């Protein structure tokens, strides 16, 4: 029986920032948030912080977002390693073209023991989960049988390791066609702050597919911990059905 994989979002990289020694400026933040403020002040050379209403990093970044000067958010970035996500969900995720992606390859990695992600609409219903599990198991059995026969067919009398590696890839790329969209995949996603804000605004919405909405909420929680001045304006709240959404009163895209 196929095992299920829980969603996991792990922070693996974030922006660091060093103030140039010849710039007479300091701030009360660090990392990406400091870099965003520096970039904004560089446009106007406002190192002395002439406006007391934007003298702190948090107040400056809130003003930047509120007026839609979002380009400065593009200087700072965050990378996540995401597991327990379905192939169908990553098909939606990769439509966000300002992110960079590195995803598990089904040509190089055999999927005989792959896990599955139970769709939220099926989750918790014993009858539906039974049907889902049976279908997933049948797909994996077909994959294993196809893979074995394709490898036997393609290998032929070519014992050389280089050719054998190629033939195995060719067998996997053909056999994977029967794997379900619910097959778990793993992916590294890197995006700048502006791209992440856009993603959260689009995918943490009630109108988004529930699996990618859960992903957006999980990413948001990590992003708020990394750069609260940039992401804490998003409020997470529950809906009547027990799921969560996130919204912000500020500008998400100019």
UniProtKB/Swiss-Prot annotation:
It catalyses: dUMP + (6R)-5,10-methylene-5,6,7,8-tetrahydrofolate + NADPH + H(+) = dTMP + (6S)-5,6,7,8-tetrahydrofolate + NADP(+). Coiled coil: none annotated. This is Flavin-dependent thymidylate synthase. GO terms for biological process: dTMP biosynthetic process; dTTP biosynthetic process; methylation. It comes from the Bacteria. InterPro entries: Thymidylate_synthase_ThyX, Thymidylate_synthase_ThyX_sf. The gene is thyX. DUMP binds at residues 92-95, 103-107, 176, 203. Catalyzes the reductive methylation of 2'-deoxyuridine-5'-monophosphate (dUMP) to 2'-deoxythymidine-5'-monophosphate (dTMP) while utilizing 5,10-methylenetetrahydrofolate (mTHF) as the methyl donor, and NADPH and FADH(2) as the reductant. Its EC number is 2.1.1.148. Its cofactor is FAD. The keyword Methyltransferase applies. Binds 4 FAD per tetramer. Each FAD binding site is formed by three monomers.
């Amino acid at each position: 029986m196929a095992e299920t994989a829980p969603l996991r979002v792990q922070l693996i990289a974030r922006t660091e920032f060093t103030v140039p020694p010849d710039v007479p400026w300091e701030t009360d933040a660090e990392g990406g948030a400091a870099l965003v403020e520096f970039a904004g002040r560089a446009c106007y050379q406002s190192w002395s912080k002439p406006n007391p209403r934007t003298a702190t990093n948090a107040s400056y970044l809130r003003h930047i977002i509120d007026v839609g000067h979002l380009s400065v958010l593009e200087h700072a970035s965050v990378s996540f390693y995401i597991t327990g996500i379905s192939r169908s969900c990553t098909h939606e995720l990769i439509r966000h073209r300002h992110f960079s992606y590195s995803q598990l390859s089904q040509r190089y990695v055999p999927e005989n023991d792959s896990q599955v992600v139970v769709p939220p609409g099926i989750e918790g219903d014993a009858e539906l989960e039974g049907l889902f599990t049976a279908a997933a198991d049948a797909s994996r059995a077909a994959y294993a049988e196809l893979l074995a026969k394709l490898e036997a067919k393609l290998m032929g009398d070519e014992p050389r390791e280089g050719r054998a590696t190629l033939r195995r890839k060719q067998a996997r790329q053909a056999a994977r066609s029967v794997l379900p969209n619910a097959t778990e995949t793993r992916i590294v996603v890197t995006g700048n702050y502006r791209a992440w804000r856009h993603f959260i605004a689009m995918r943490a919405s009630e109108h988004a597919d529930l699996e990618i909405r859960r992903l957006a909420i999980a990413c948001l929680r990590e992003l708020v911990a990394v750069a609260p001045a940039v992401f804490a304006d998003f409020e997470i709240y529950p809906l009547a059905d027990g799921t969560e959404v996130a919204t912000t009163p500020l500008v998400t895209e100019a």
